[in-house]
A protein has these predicted regions:
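A generic local structural motif
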Residues: 27-29, 80-85, 100-105
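Core catalytic region of metal-dependent phosphoesterases/phosphodiesterases
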Residues: 1-74
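Short, conserved active-site loop motifs that form the nucleotide-linked donor/cofactor pocket
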Residues: 40, 77-79, 94
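Active-site-proximal loop/helix segment associated with metal-binding centers of metalloenzymes
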Residues: 58-86, 120, 136-148
Length: 169
């Protein structure tokens, strides 16, 4: 997804790209990814939803907004969902979300199924929880943030650092 640093509700760094420049450069990267992955299911995030949240706070109806596919410059093969549940190879359900709680295994307990989530830059793990009927797991996939980027400079005030990661099922 795109970071949308320049659209953030937080103060933007004047030495970083404007929203338009950031969008154009992001579209190029997403187009490259689309060539590799022409069909993808993605979950909405606090970054991807930025254009909608900024429009809402400024009184702009969603009908005046272009779709996220158009904004990102990708085709209809990419589909975004608020959250997504699918069946795994063993027939069990898997719940995917951008981020609901930092405690992923607790989310697996609450959902009653295995879960995958991101958002929490400093969390990368797989944890298990079980009961007499089922063994579920939670996968926290870290992030793909560039810790040296000026857009992530706010992190320098925290002791924890992002963990680069990716999950594969």
């Amino acid at each position: 997804e795109l970071d949308y640093h320049a659209l953030s509700f937080h103060a933007s760094d004047p030495d970083l790209d404007s929203a338009g420049v950031e969008l154009k450069s992001g579209q190029k990267v997403l187009k490259e990814l689309e060539e590799i992955f022409p069909e993808m299911v993605l979950v909405d995030s606090n970054h991807g939803s930025m254009k909608y949240r900024k429009a809402k706070v400024n009184g702009i109806p969603r009908e005046l907004m272009v779709s996220y596919n158009v904004a990102c410059g990708v085709g209809e093969g990419w589909t975004w969902f608020n959250n997504f549940t699918t069946k795994m190879a063993d027939g069990r359900e898997l719940f995917m979300t951008h981020g609901m709680t930092k405690n992923g295994v607790q989310l697996a307990r609450e959902m009653g199924m295995c879960v995958i989530q991101g958002h929490y830059h400093t969390e990368f793990n797989i944890q298990y929880c079980g009961n007499p009927n089922v063994l579920n797991w939670s996968m926290m996939v870290g992030c793909l943030i560039n810790n040296r980027s000026m857009a992530f400079a706010y992190n320098k005030t925290f002791p924890a650092r992002p963990i680069l990661g990716c999950g594969l099922i």
